[in-house]
């Protein structure tokens, strides 16, 4: 992981209790590979998963839930290891990334790591309610599902809103200069 990455996530990396929960997966080659793929906007899949993992860990800890499973599964929930933007056009709806990637992430997570039942449930069901029949079994599964939606939205909408605000300000300045 690059120096820039380490600087960006310094607070998280220095959280010893969090790192103890994820130490066996955080620096693994499989998890590092997620940095090669864009998830939302300019955010890589690794950055997205770290954000989901850390926020879920903090909330789970506050709520006295299984924060270790939340942290680990949050980090692995999108371990699908492909560029989902390159999906072939014309695939039937059930083949779309949003519906299929949790299973691929779970397959990869099982391949590289030892998971408990709760972590498996979290990874497999994190796209609920999109995946209607995959209803989360644990509170931690619901938590990661909600944190994932929040994080995805902030990674997608906030940068667009900032750009829109910048363009709006530019327009106002140009308009104001006409009437000087």
Task: Say what each PLM segment does.
Residues 1-180:
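Metal-dependent phosphohydrolase cores
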């Amino acid at each position: 992981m690059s120096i820039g990455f380490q600087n960006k996530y310094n607070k998280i990396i220095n959280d010893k209790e969090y790192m103890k929960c994820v130490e066996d997966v955080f620096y693994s080659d499989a998890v590092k590979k997620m940095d090669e793929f864009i998830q939302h906007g300019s955010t890589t899949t690794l950055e997205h998963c770290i954000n989901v993992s850390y926020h879920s860990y903090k909330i789970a800890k506050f709520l006295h839930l299984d924060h270790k499973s939340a942290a680990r599964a949050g980090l692995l929930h999108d371990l699908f290891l492909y560029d989902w933007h390159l999906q072939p056009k014309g695939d039937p709806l059930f083949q779309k990334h949003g519906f299929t990637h949790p299973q691929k992430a779970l397959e990869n997570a099982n391949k590289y790591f030892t998971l408990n039942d709760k972590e498996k449930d979290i990874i497999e069901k994190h796209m609920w309610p999109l995946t209607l029949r995959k209803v989360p079994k644990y509170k931690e599964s619901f938590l990661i599902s909600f944190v994932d939606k929040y994080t995805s939205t902030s990674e997608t909408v906030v940068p667009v809103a900032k750009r829109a605000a910048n363009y709006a300000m530019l327009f106002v300045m140009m308009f104001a200069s006409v009437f000087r």
